[in-house]
Regions:
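His/acidic metal-ligating clusters that form di-metal
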Residues: 49-55, 66-68, 100-166, 220-221
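Binuclear metal-dependent phosphoesterase catalytic core
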Residues: 2-23, 118, 146, 170-221
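Core catalytic region of metal-dependent phosphoesterases/phosphodiesterases
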Residues: 2-117
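Short C-terminal domain-edge/linker segments immediately following a structured domain
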Residues: 60-65, 124-125, 152-159, 181-185, ...
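Active-site-proximal beta-strand elements of phosphoester/diester hydrolases
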Residues: 28-36, 121-128, 167-172, 199
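Conserved beta-sheet core of the metallophosphoesterase superfamily
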Residues: 74-78, 85-88, 132-197
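Catalytic metal-binding/acid-base residues of hydrolase active sites
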Residues: 36, 62-63, 94-95, 128-130, ...
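Flexible, glycine-rich phosphate/dinucleotide-binding loops
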Residues: 38, 65, 96, 131, ...
């Protein structure tokens, strides 16, 4: 459960929770991006995966959807239990740089965050400034300059996992997928020697029920 104190720009956690994340031998990180106003989908993602994860990363475009869930968690204990102890957010091209909430007068949202998980340093950014819809070359160069071991990004709305130059992943959009992909999210599995992602697509039944189904993105390198 997250106490919603903004320890530093882009990260909600206590100093203790941040330190515990840095000291972990292995960790599970919930990753999603580009909700674009679909707050109910964000709620479903956290209800399904939040309690099982050590942290959550939102890679931009739809910050208000997450902040709305955090507002509700302030009033409902059940919802607060869905939120992991560390939450990392970055600003997308459709997000504001700051928000006012009941739990934090000024939520400052940076364009980039370097999140330390165990022995890994994860660069989190939306990716629009690095033009990821065309290539990840600039993104990988930025990660190298920041001494990152991995990159999480969004913007393209296309799920991708790339382990060629540096490990990078895009969970795709949880609401508006592109290029015949499915709406979904991912769980980043991190250990001292390895890092990989399990992708989940959201399947909708005729009754409106949602199911999260593991799958391999079409674009993997």
């Amino acid at each position: 459960m997250n106490c919603f104190s903004q320890l530093e720009n882009g990260i909600f956690a206590t100093e203790k929770d941040i330190q515990e994340l840095k000291n972990k031998d292995s960790a599970h990180i919930l990753v999603y991006s580009d909700s674009h106003g679909k707050a109910p989908v964000v709620r479903d993602i956290f209800e399904k995966f939040g309690q099982k994860c050590d942290a959550a990363i939102f890679a931009g475009d739809g910050i208000f959807d997450l902040l709305a869930l955090m507002e509700k968690a302030n009033s409902y204990d059940e919802i607060s239990e869905w939120l992991p102890p560390v939450i990392c957010i970055v600003r997308g091209n459709n997000d504001s740089g700051s928000y006012e909430t009941s739990f934090c007068r000024a939520v400052h949202v940076p364009k980039k965050v370097l999140l330390k998980v165990g022995a890994k340093r994860i660069l989190v950014t939306h990716g629009h400034e690095e033009r990821v819809q065309h290539s990840t070359e600039l993104l990988e160069s930025t990660a190298n300059l920041m001494d990152a071991n991995a990159v999480v990004y969004g913007h393209s709305h296309i799920p991708v996992e790339n382990n060629h130059v540096i490990y990078s992943m895009n969970p795709g959009s949880c609401s508006y997928p592109r290029s015949l992909s499915k709406p979904g999210c991912a769980v980043l599995e991190i250990s001292e020697k390895n890092i990989f992602s399990i992708f989940y697509k959201i399947d909708f039944s005729i009754f409106g029920l949602k199911d999260f189904v593991p799958y391999f993105p079409d674009r993997m390198y």
